[in-house]
Amino acid sequence: MGASFSALFIDQDGVSSSSPCLGDLPESCVASIIQHLDPPEICKLAKLNRAFSAASWADFVWESKLPPNYHILVHKILGFVPRNLGKRDIYTRLCRPNTFDGGTKKVWLHKSTGGVCMSISSKGLQITGVDDRRYWNHIPTNESRFHSIAYLRQIWWFEVNGEVEFPFPVGTYSVFFRLQLGRASRGFG
């Protein structure tokens, strides 16, 4: 097979007219290879040439990057399952922070790992005295994903409760609280 492929690039005098290049690889072959790469690497390779660009749109490449229950996630986040979107488009939409549950939660896929990430605003949790202005202020800010933070003025105890009903894929997850401790500044309080 290699000899007959090489013969395509030799003219009648036995002189090589042009040599084979990466663009000559079959699209299915390229797609089979790039499916083993991380999504950012796939997107970088898509800029190489037309063959890599076309292969980067193959549904089977992106289906392997999506969580197993991505149909449920798409329905939960978008409210419908788009029938005319390719898997790459679905992956791209899920990688953006998608707001749901009355704007109190955002969910997205980690671009490199495909893991599901979620952020919950202070308004999406039950926090001790959060609605009492003697203890808390809600301050608009661009530093928060939700464009608002709960600023604690004073309190004697602090409890946070919350429940999440979400179709997370099977796996191990971590929970983090973002708190900023320090003195009150002019803008806060």
Residue ranges of predicted features:
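CRL adaptor-proximal regions
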Residues: 1-35
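Plant-skewed but cross-kingdom recognition/interaction modules and surfaces
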Residues: 3, 32, 55, 59-189
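Generic preference for well-ordered secondary structure
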Residues: 17-18, 36, 46-50, 146-148, ...
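Conserved aromatic-histidine-acidic binding/catalytic patches
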Residues: 21, 40, 165
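Short hydrophobic alpha-helical "box" of cullin-RING ligase substrate receptors
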Residues: 25-37, 42, 46-56, 62
